[in-house]
Amino acid sequence: MTTASNTPLPSGLRKPLDQFYEYLRAEKGLSLHTQRNYKQQLETMAEHLHSMGLKAWPQVDAGWVRQLAGKGMREGMKASSIATRLSSLRSFFDFLILRGILTANPAKGVSAPRKKRPLPKNLDVDEVNQLLEVNEDDPLAIRDRAIMELMYGAGLRLAELVDIDVRDVHLRSGEIRVIGKGNKERKVPFAGMAVEWVGKWLKVRSGLADPSEPALFVSKLGTRISHRSVQKRMAEWGQKQAVASHITPHKLRHSFATHILESSNNLRAVQELLGHENISTTQIYTHLDFQHLADVYDQAHPRARKKSSQHKEEDE
């Protein structure tokens, strides 16, 4: 944003600012550092409003506030810096409401731009194949490969995977019932190597699981496996299989999404498969049924195409 100019602010802008600074000092008891931060933010915004022809704070509406935020974005300000300025402005407007200068806070409905979170690097298909070439007969190794095949084969969140019960898995139809964010239930297709290795795990699971334990994946103690255990075992397998990238559950989920999208170019289906919340809005305009999702999955997923030749498992 522009720096303060030498042109004095009109009294309609200047006087309320000075009153607010005194309020911060005398009544709020804020530190000098915090007071300076408020003043720096507000002076810059006041100068910009003045340059746009405003002479008093009651002239400011949500549109002007959005212009301030937009100007910051265009000038390359960080999202966190814009959020700080909007926060200062909201506090100032609340003060003006207390003083009867404003009747409503025009910055209340204006959101700062979201901070861009860098996506985790995904594995390429060769790295995934290298990771998943686990052919040990130990029940825990079979379990771990089933977990990784399912995580990559269905794009599940870690919490979704850990919460799966045996009754949620249907091998013959290639469906898993999962509970996603917001306690929302969805059916997820899985196939090929994921079906094969979950089936292998189910054959040896009874040797580890307590008879009353409903969880699909259990620890060596026979109870539902923990999030931390899954993370730890995946990282260990990444090292054991000499995969260069650090292996995490979310990296497998992200790789699933990337590889499906690269193969199908069907962003809408990928969003459905991942269970993203914003799908509920787009479903008003277009609805993809489960069979369509399963078809996209079967055609696009690199390991779904590796069908086991004579897989005849019953539903578990």
UniProtKB/Swiss-Prot annotation:
UniProtKB keywords: Cell cycle, Cell division, Chromosome partition, Cytoplasm, DNA integration, DNA recombination, DNA-binding
CDD domains hit by this protein: INT_XerDC_C (cd00798)
Keyword S-adenosyl-L-methionine: no
Any GO molecular function: DNA binding
Domain (Core-binding (CB)) ranges: 11-97
Protein's name in the database: Tyrosine recombinase XerC
Active site: 157, 181, 250, 253, 276, 285
Keyword Disulfide bond annotated: no
Coiled-coil portions: none
